[in-house]
A protein has these predicted regions:
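Conserved glycine-rich cofactor-binding loop
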Residues: 9-10
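Substrate-binding pocket helix/loop in short-chain dehydrogenase/reductase
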Residues: 76-93, 188
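Alpha-helical segment proximal to the catalytic Tyr-Lys
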Residues: 109, 154-155, 216
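Short, small/polar-rich loop/turn modules that mediate ligand/substrate recognition or access, typified
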Residues: 157-162, 218-220
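Residue(s) in the substrate-gating loop at a strand-loop-helix junction
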Residues: 124
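Short C-terminal tail/terminal secondary-structure segment
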Residues: 73, 129, 208, 219-232
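Active-site helix of classical SDR
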Residues: 104, 141, 149
Length: 232
């Protein structure tokens, strides 16, 4: 299958790119700067999602699956000045949620011409459990992804357009390592019944399954991969 994967330069995205490629899929990956073979798009620019979609479509010819993985995890204190607070919220929502919505809208239009397709959104445990006092905006953006996923699943199933989400907990990526180090890794690990954080390859395999093998009746499903640190 032809797949567009955002946020493919590191962590979960890089692992997913490798997993999907190894499974025989044709994948166009994205990063902010477009290092190597990755296509460049800075999602803080409102025009970037459409430009990326058009470039990926030109390269692949058609797209069967969109994986929205790109995101930022940046702190903002609740006592920041108004300008900094609003800037942080605007940036996080633009990159984590608006860009995913824009790409999903373009994917829906394309999928309708091809008899269907799949969207896999990479959200977070924070969508349900919340996050730190410095990361309201991050949790809110990921909760928005869940609501968007369910809306797409319900609204477009009749067109054979399926939507799924993955909610990782702590995963061995640069963002998680920084977070664990800043907040006391041992204490946080004690809150994970499995006793360890997830490996990026575990999230990647979940994404691969949703992108290619999950049954159609599972559309709208949100898969938790968090070592039972949050159970819904």
């Amino acid at each position: 299958m032809n797949i567009l994967l955002t946020g493919a330069s590191r962590g979960i995205g890089a692992a997913t790119l490798a997993t999907l490629t190894d499974a025989g899929h044709r994948v166009v990956g994205h990063s902010t700067t477009g290092a190597g073979a990755l296509l460049a798009a800075d999602f803080s620019d409102p025009a970037a999602p459409r430009a990326l979609w058009d470039e990926a479509l030109a390269e692949l010819g058609h797209i069967a699956v969109l994986v929205n993985n790109a995101g930022v995890f940046e702190a903002i204190a609740d006592d920041s000045d108004d300008a900094a607070w609003h800037a942080a919220w605007s940036r996080t929502l633009a990159i984590n949620l608006q860009a995913s919505a824009d790409l999903s809208r373009l994917a829906l239009a394309h999928f309708r011409t091809r008899g269907g397709g799949r969207i896999v959104n990479v959200a977070s445990r924070a969508a349900y459990r919340g996050d730190s006092p410095q990361h309201w905006h991050y949790a809110a953006s990921k909760a928005g992804m869940i609501a968007m996923t369910k809306s797409i699943a319900r609204g477009y199933a009749a067109d054979n357009i399926l939507a799924f989400a993955v909610c990782p907990g702590f995963t061995m990526t640069g963002m998680a390592e920084e977070y664990l180090g800043s907040r006391g890794g041992e204490k946080l690990l004690a809150d994970i019944p499995l006793g360890r954080v997830a490996d990026a390859s575990e999230i990647a395999e979940t994404i691969r399954w949703l992108a290619s093998d999950a049954p159609a009746s599972a559309t709208g499903a949100v898969i938790d991969v968090n070592g039972a640190s949050y159970v819904r």
